[in-house]
Amino acid sequence: MNRSHQLLSVLAIIFYGVMVVGSMMQFLAYYELTSLPSVRQVSLMLVGICAVVCFYASIVYFVEISSRG
């Protein structure tokens, strides 16, 4: 495997993690102001689903690049 491809995939995983954490913080800050527990639970569920999807996409991306290189 090429080292630049490995570095690129690691950076992509870090980027996805930062995006997920940032969006979770935005959801929490917004729904703390509205203070609706049902909306907060739904938003947390949606953020969790997005986190799982982004993590799975980064793993698929990493495997695809490592199989190419």
Swiss-Prot record:
UniProtKB keywords: Host membrane, Membrane, Transmembrane, Transmembrane helix
Membrane topology: Multi-pass membrane protein
Transmembrane parts of this sequence: 7-27, 42-62
One of the record's GO cellular component terms: membrane
Location(s) in or outside the cell: Host membrane
Residue ranges of coiled coil: none
Name of the protein described by the UniProt record: Putative transmembrane protein ORF34
Organism in which the protein naturally occurs: His1 virus (isolate Australia/Victoria)
